[in-house]
Regions:
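Short, amphipathic alpha-helical interface elements at domain boundaries
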Residues: 1-247
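Short, exposed beta-strand "edge-strand" segments with a Pro/Gly-rich flavor and a Y/T-containing core
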Residues: 9-14, 90-94, 194-198, 335-342, ...
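Helix N-cap / beta->alpha transition motif
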Residues: 94-105, 158-159, 199, 275, ...
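Extended alpha-helical interface modules used as scaffolds for assembling large macromolecular complexes
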Residues: 214-529, 533-538, 545-548, 559-577
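Primarily hydrophobic membrane-targeting regions of prokaryotic envelope proteins
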Residues: 22-25, 63-68, 79-87, 164-167, ...
Length: 577
């Protein structure tokens, strides 16, 4: 048992619950760890493995301060965070296990880094174009995740199949993981059960202008930066980022990924210079997209509708219009001028999501420069007439029922092999299934049957296949039960508790103790005792000098020190009452 743990255990016992929870979370302590008291907690936090996990998480300034403290100097203003991490004692000195771990590492050095050079007009233009491309690619990614959640690998990266599918939209596959990380930081996507899903805030973001979309992304990017890169409310010059976690072997790769996301967002130019619009963000001010907006292409609010069931946007379509149009048509190409194609399936999907023939035609008439061609009007009205031919609802018995005025269609569904999992049974009123209503509906929709869900009143219901979760930060581990358990074992006399632990450790290791006993007359006597047992408030062992077995009341023991650790497991700690 280590005597270095005793001061830390006393400090932990006196710390507020919130401070303990923050410490445990920062040190990566599991909420279900099997500690019985604060001495266990202190010893675990001072274990070499725990210290080795904590040191790579220190930013440069704290690493330098810890090294100064190990060298006997004052840690300065950074002593507070290091004490809160249990890497320094309250007096600002390191425990020997921490000193040993720090001494074994390379000395970190801090130096002043000047701000990056401002971008020239050419570099800024390329950065603005990249930012515009990134915002558009993120919108595509969020829309895809809204329709169908994206599969993730165990490590959190997008699955290769998803990358191939997304790359078909024109996004470079090598940027997809960075784009997904930007979207997660902005709260547009969330990882749930190894799937990437769109959140509730994604829809409102999709309908904002390009500059407003960019503003939300870069401010979220700044808020998610590691604390070692932060400078107040802003960030350190990007040229200083690589040196900010000197003891982390994983940092070079992480830093490269963060810098690439900054480049994708147009915050860093290709030559490492800084565009004008990145300066307020670095200095901690709100984002100002005005200088960026001047370099972005002008958004349009009108399209050309053509007889071949396509639509052409003569420039970047306003995001709100683009999002709604893509709910009705399939986008075939994305560039300065985008093209869209209307199909029976795309119109049916719009009807399923709550549109009507009238709302679709009114919307298209409002944004069209060429009116509505007759073939497109015919496609919308015919699809609307067929939509809802199959009605799915729950009857009074709780079973799912499928009804239609078209008996031939019901017969076809009854023998369709694609619908076998539903186990549809025919009766006089239609088809029934033991599967849930939503399951039946989406299976029929996937099989391209014109189905709709209706409520008890017979009115159509709009059902979201992939309901968006609300955006919330990851839940912090709940350390309250652990802290409560530690406090339950916290006695009023820390010295006595520590002595009990020392004696228990000596008994387990069969060590030889130099025990100081308080005699009835108030004098003290020392005994060399080979500890053999502890119980009932008494310590048992063989007195080496007299070669007899002795039983000593623990309350009479003033102190106990291991003098022959080789006799047992090597315990070297001391204890005093």
């Amino acid at each position: 048992m280590s005597t270095h743990a005793r001061p830390l255990a006393v400090w932990l016992a006196q710390a507020p619950d919130a401070q303990l929870a923050a410490l445990f979370e920062a040190r990566g302590v599991r909420a279900d760890v099997a500690w019985s008291d604060f001495f266990d907690a202190a010893e675990a936090l001072l274990e070499p493995a725990s210290i080795e996990r904590a040191l790579p998480r220190l930013p440069l300034t704290e690493a330098v301060a810890l090294r100064r403290s190990v060298n006997g100097d004052d840690a300065g203003d950074d002593a507070g965070p290091l004490i809160a991490l249990a890497l320094l004692r309250p007096d600002g000195t390191p425990a020997p296990p921490v000193a040993e771990a720090v001494t074994a590492r390379q000395d970190p050095t801090a130096s002043e880094t000047p701000p990056p050079e401002p971008s020239d007009e050419s570099a800024a233009a390329r950065a603005a174009e990249r930012a515009f491309t990134t915002v558009a690619a993120l919108a595509d990614l969020v829309l895809l995740a809204s329709d169908t959640p994206l599969a993730l690998l165990t490590g959190g990266a997008l699955a290769s199949g998803e990358k191939r599918r997304i790359a078909a939209t024109g996004t470079a596959p090598e940027t997809l993981d960075d784009l997904a990380a930007i979207a997660v930081d902005a709260g547009l996507l969330a990882a749930l059960d190894r799937r990437l899903v769109a959140t509730e805030s994604a829809d409102s973001w999709l309908r904002e202008s390009a500059s407003a979309r960019w503003t939300g992304l870069v401010q979220a990017f700044r808020a998610a930066l590691p604390r070692g890169l932060r400078d107040g409310d802003g960030w350190l010059p990007t040229t200083a980022w690589a040196a900010q976690y000197p003891w982390s072997t994983a940092w070079p790769e992480q830093c490269s990924a963060i810098a690439e996301r900054a480049r994708l967002l147009g915050l860093i130019a290709d030559d490492g210079s800084e565009p004008e619009w990145a300066v307020p963000l670095r200095e901690g001010a709100p984002a100002d997209p005005a200088s960026l907006q001047r370099m972005l292409p002008t958004e349009v609010d009108r399209i050309f509708l053509q007889n071949d069931l396509t639509a052409i946007a003569p420039g970047p379509l306003q995001p709100a219009l683009d999002v709604r149009l893509r709910r009705i048509a399939v986008r075939e190409s994305a560039a300065q001028a985008s093209s869209y194609r209307f199909t029976a399936d795309s119109v049916a999907q719009a009807l399923t999501s709550g549109e009507t023939a009238a709302s679709i035609l009114d919307f298209l008439a409002e944004i069209s420069l060429t009116g509505i061609p007759q073939p497109l009007e015919y496609l919308v009205t015919q699809t609307d007439q067929r939509h809802g031919l199959v009605r799915v609802f729950t009857d009074a018995s709780g079973r799912t029922r499928v009804a239609s005025v078209d008996a031939t269609l019901l017969d076809a569904m009854g023998v369709d092999q694609a619908l076998r999992p539903l186990a549809l049974a025919r009766d006089a009123d239609g088809l029934t299934s033991r599967a849930g209503r939503d399951t039946v509906y989406w299976t029929l929709t996937d099989a391209r049957y014109p189905a709709m869900i209706v409520g008890d009143d017979g009115r159509p219901l709009v059902v979201d296949r992939n309901p968006a979760p609300g955006h919330a930060p990851p839940a912090a581990p709940d350390y309250l039960p652990l802290i409560a358990r530690l406090r339950e074992r916290q006695g009023p006399d820390a010295d006595a508790a520590w002595l009990d632990r020392e004696l228990e450790a000596a008994v387990r290791s069969k060590a030889v103790l130099l025990v100081e006993i308080e005699m009835p007359d108030g004098t003290a006597r020392e005994l060399q005792l080979e500890a053999s047992g502890l119980g009932g408030g008494r310590l048992r062992g063989r007195d080496r000098a007299a070669d007899v077995e002795r039983t000593l009341p623990v309350r009479s023991i003033r102190s106990a020190r291991v003098i022959d650790p080789s006799a047992g497991s090597g315990a070297t700690a001391t204890g005093e009452r």
